[in-house]
Curated annotation (Swiss-Prot):
Chief site of localization: nucleus
Keyword field: DNA-binding, Nucleus, Transcription, Transcription regulation
The encoding gene: ets2-b
The name this protein goes by in its record: Protein c-ets-2-B
Transmembrane segments: none
Lineage: Eukaryota, Metazoa, Chordata, Craniata, Vertebrata
Organism annotation: Xenopus laevis (African clawed frog)
Pfam families cross-referenced by the UniProt entry: Ets, Ets1_N_flank, SAM_PNT
One of the record's GO cellular component terms: nucleus
One annotated GO biological process: regulation of transcription by RNA polymerase II
Segment forming the signal sequence: none
Length: 472
């Protein structure tokens, strides 16, 4: 017995010594030809497997067998749906800004608003807005090739697809021109049509946009007859050059085209230089209450006295913005405007609807002061907001309810009184609304509501059955 416990060595399988000559390692050494190159045979045997890949060699040269995913109908549908979802964002913005849904009816302001939305949506930089200084009819008439030549790189096809989709949509619907009383009615609804040399049906609530003169969107601005001068003209927009303001005294329409172009250039220059505020504001601060696009709306709301001169919008006028720009003629009051529209106040409805007031003043989206007037002239709201009986003074009996309704109107469910009060405080410096000292939640309109609305405080109080507030 051996030390390994094997009794009979014959039981151990014989070791085969022939396999050593078949080892790959031995084969490599057998191929050595130069003694100093020990591994040359090994490299020679595996040189094809040891080649360093370039990254391109892993792909077949035959394009038919390419492993990269091709653009299939399914992937095209996904991309198309993604673009449609993006375009739906502009549909919401269009409704908020009062832009006609039919791009053929856009004015120069609407075209610019669309481009601003696109620049923000697609993070475009160095967009030359001056290339698109045209109205909707001119824009849609460009055709794809000319449009792509003007559009920013890489997104021209997407923008044209969006524009073409909007054009096809309204060609299929063949509906009447877009009218949105909740934002901005046509200015010639309430101006004297004869003074601008075009006619409007008095029974028609809104005139069609394409009935305007073709020489620009600014021909509906204030018309000053020959011989009349402006008294103490104050710039209603801080970027107005004083020399341009004086041009209001010339006769229109001959000079209106140059006036519009020069002022639009000022706006476009500010856009291209990055001086304009962010296109779309967040929920914080006074941006929650007033339209940040008032910079653009101010260009379409210069028509006459009742045009936000007395009650300025978010940032369109200076502190004395309640001075008139056209003192040569007696302005139409809101009361007369309602009568001309053949829309008398209905029972159970506000005497001063905010949507109609916004269209009357040309302020664009409904503003906070307009919304408060609507609530104050609605008998059903007297439990949470009402006149005190002392002139234009009013009280928020339930400020949270007022804030909730304002948030519902502006589609901001997180609105509360703290945020709403920021909008009210903004009005302090603009001499629109002041806080009544010593009284909680009591405010007063200090602007010229009498001439704007055509009602005295006593008339409104009598219509609403308001009794003097004896609470301190």
């Amino acid at each position: 017995m051996t030390e390994f416990g094997i009794r009979n060595m014959d039981q151990v399988a014989p070791v085969y010594n022939g396999h050593r000559g078949m080892l790959k390692r031995q084969l490599a050494f057998d191929n050595v030809q130069v003694p100093t190159s020990l591994y040359c045979g090994l490299f020679s045997a595996y040189e094809e497997e040891q080649a360093v890949p370039t990254g391109l060699d892993s792909y077949p040269h035959d394009s038919s067998s390419c492993e990269l995913p091709l653009l299939t109908p399914c992937s095209k549908a996904v991309m198309s749906q993604a673009l449609k979802d993006t375009f739906n964002g502009f549909a919401k913005e269009r409704c908020r800004l009062g832009i006609p849904g039919n791009p053929w009816l856009w004015d120069e302001n609407n075209v610019l608003q669309w481009l601003l939305w696109a620049a923000k949506e697609f993070s475009l930089e160095n967009v030359n807005f001056q290339k698109f200084l045209m109205n909707g009819h001119e824009l849609c008439s460009l055709g794809k090739e000319r449009f792509l030549a003007l559009a920013p790189d890489f997104v021209g096809d997407i923008l044209w697809e969006h524009l073409e989709e909007m054009m096809k949509e309204y060609q299929e619907k063949a509906q009447e021109p877009y009218i949105d009383h909740s934002n901005r009615d046509s200015l010639n609804q309430w101006m004297n049509a004869d003074s601008l040399n075009f006619t409007a049906d008095p029974l028609q609530c809104g005139a069609q946009v394409h009935n305007y003169p073709k020489n620009g969107m600014y021909n509906d601005m204030c018309s000053v007859p020959t011989g009349q001068t402006l008294l103490n003209p104050k710039q209603e927009f801080q970027q107005y050059p004083s020399s341009c303001l004086k041009s209001r005294a010339v006769n229109y329409p001959p000079a209106s085209q140059d006036f519009a172009r020069s002022h639009m250039n000022v706006l476009l220059n500010s856009l291209n230089s990055g001086k304009l505020r962010d296109y779309d504001s967040g929920d914080s601060g006074t941006e929650s209450f007033e339209s940040t696009e008032s910079l653009l709306h101010s260009w379409t709301s210069q028509s006459s006295l009742v045009d936000m001169q007395r009650v300025p919008s978010y940032d369109s006028f200076e502190e004395d913005g309640n001075q008139t720009l056209c003192l040569n003629k007696q302005p139409m009051s809101f009361k007369d405007y309602i009568q001309d529209r053949c829309e008398p106040a209905e029972l159970g409805k506000p005497v001063i609807p905010a949507s109609i007031l916004a269209g009357f003043t040309g302020s664009g989206p409904i503003q906070l002061w307009q919304f408060l007037l609507e609530l104050l002239t609605d008998k059903s709201c007297q439990s949470f907001i009402s006149w005190t009986g002392d002139g234009w003074e009013f009280k928020l009996a339930d400020p949270d309810e007022v804030a909730r309704r304002w948030g519902k109107r502006k589609n901001k469910p997180k609105m509360n009184y703290e945020k709403l009060s920021r909008g009210l405080r903004y009005y302090y410096d603009k001499n629109i609304i002041h806080k009544t000292s010593g009284k909680r939640y009591v405010y007063r309109f200090v602007c010229d509501l009498h001439n704007l609305l055509g009602y005295t405080p006593d008339e409104l109080h009598a219509m609403l059955g308001v009794q003097p507030d004896t609470d301190e």
